[in-house]
Amino acid sequence: MIMRFGYVSHAMALWDCSPAKTITFTSFQKLSKQEREDKLYDVTKQNLEHTLRILHYNIAHEIPLYRLSSSIVPLATHPEVEFDYIGAFTPLWRKIGALIKEHNLRISFHPNQFTLFTSDKPHITTNAITDMTYHYKVLDAIGIADSSYINIHVGGAYGNKEKAIERFHENIKKLPAHIKKQMTLENDDKTYTTAETLSICQKEKIPFVFDYHHHMANLCEEPLEELLPAIFETWSHTNIVPKVHISSPKSKKEFRAHAEYIDLEFIKPFLHVAKKINHNFDIMIESKQKDLAMLQFIQELSSIRGIKRISSSTLQW
């Protein structure tokens, strides 16, 4: 069983390398037309250059997974902001894409919790489609839209989970098919359990990104031993291995909050279930210390008998 690792957005080991520098709309409004264009251009350019730095760092550390920042283009989906963020940076997008393809990196996006398809308000669905389209356009500009995924949560329950799930199935039809083909769903820590998310994924033929921390915060009746094989099966129509999210609680009191690093004892039960299935899968680390937490966790895991480190960020068990 091969386990490959990655982390989210910011490389903590790199100085001043945020790929998510931004400008608020309030500040944006105060600028002249030329100043607005210059500011959007400068901030986006810096984010793309920082993304390139991070990718080089990942390659040097043999880190095969990476989640791009959704804030790579500031104010990209704001209705009052017009900015050709694709055409203005074609060489940089292509440079990023060439690096990703040359080193076979697995890239993803994770829009925020407001991108959902369970609302009864049409404008919420419209905004979700706009946001998904933005993420897809970035992946397309990079040249990896057919091999990368945009991960979201199911959404809210709005007092009636059954009705909300029905709305999800209806609203998702409005998302263009080529974008839906590149989306994944994740179980959340309060509303939609692993079993509920799995059912939706199976019906819509959407790959399921399983989050173990969320699962433990929002347990369902079905045991993980039954759920995990079915979760992995949702990836069978793709040409890539399943991906899971790993983090551990900040404390018992703040169970849903992410800790700085990974608590191996918290994760062990999941790993033992995964080992019984013996299916290759990828792990996205969602701890606060990102790449540092990931490398420390890999080091801890590699000291366990039977687990072999075959590269800086890949283990065999």
Curated annotation (Swiss-Prot):
Which SUPFAM superfamilies does this one have?
Xylose isomerase-like
Looking at the record's lineage, which domain of life comes first?
Answer: Bacteria
Q: Which InterPro entries match?
A: UvdE, UvdE_bac, Xyl_isomerase-like_sf
A molecular function (GO) term = endonuclease activity
Specify the enzyme's EC class, one word: hydrolase
Per the UniProt record, which EC number(s) apply here? 3.-.-.-
Which family does the UniProt entry place this protein in? Answer: Belongs to the uve1/UvsE family.
Q: What does this protein do?
A: Component in a DNA repair pathway. Removal of UV LIGHT damaged nucleotides. Recognizes pyrimidine dimers and cleave a phosphodiester bond immediately 5' to the lesion.
**The protein's name:** UV DNA damage endonuclease
Native species = Bacillus thuringiensis subsp. konkukian (strain 97-27)
What is this protein's gene name?
A: uvsE
